Amino acid sequence: MQKEIRRDDIIGSRRFSNYFWAVFLCSGGISFLLAGISSYFKINFLPFANPKELAFIPQGLVMSFYGTLSIALAIYILGTLFWDIGSGYNEYNKVENLVKIVRKGFPGKNREILLTYPLTNIRAIGIKISEGLNPKRSIYLCLKDERQIPLTPVQQPNSISNLEEEAAELAKFLDLKLENL
């Protein structure tokens, strides 16, 4: 029975890089906001600097703006970490003849995203590799109606050999051809 069902877990937003950026933006944002407030009230709120000597307009105002923006972005990233946005699984079920793609979204009516496709509607497994400044290496589910559904999570790009091996295993499991997109 286990040879008829394959399940690949997907790590969502709970990656080290997101924790790093949340802490970095939060600490930097608080520091900038306190520096801006210190320059306005002429009271030093930072133990490691003396921002009360800064002119509030324009330096203190700009630092307050950047601090507020940074804290807002950190709160957004912490929200994605808390709700584990993007996590889920891909299930390939030969018994039910279905492919299920499940992901967590933001709270609301679409909190859980469920995509279900019959195996008969799947044309191939596709690999898309684009190099450059922002390289992307992904595996896609190619449907007969020409849609391409991404299967790989957002992360640092895998090596090309690992990506090809993973795609070949999946294509072999589903008895589908492998395409280069």
UniProtKB/Swiss-Prot annotation:
The coiled-coil regions, if any, are: none
Q: State which residue ranges cross the membrane.
A: 19-41, 61-83
Q: Which GO terms describe its biological process?
A: photosynthesis
**What is the membrane topology noted in the UniProt record heading this document?**
Multi-pass membrane protein
Instruction: Give the main localization category.
Output: plastid
The lineage's top-level taxon is Eukaryota
Q: Where does it live in the cell?
A: Plastid, Chloroplast thylakoid membrane
Q: Which Pfam families match?
A: Ycf4
Q: Which UniProt keywords apply?
A: Chloroplast, Membrane, Photosynthesis, Plastid, Thylakoid, Transmembrane, Transmembrane helix
Q: What GO CC annotations are associated with the protein?
A: chloroplast thylakoid membrane; photosystem I
Entry keyword tRNA processing: no
Q: List the disulfide bonds.
A: none
Family according to the record: Belongs to the Ycf4 family.
Xref: HAMAP family: Ycf4
Q: What does this protein do?
A: Seems to be required for the assembly of the photosystem I complex.
Any idea what this protein is called?
Answer: Photosystem I assembly protein Ycf4
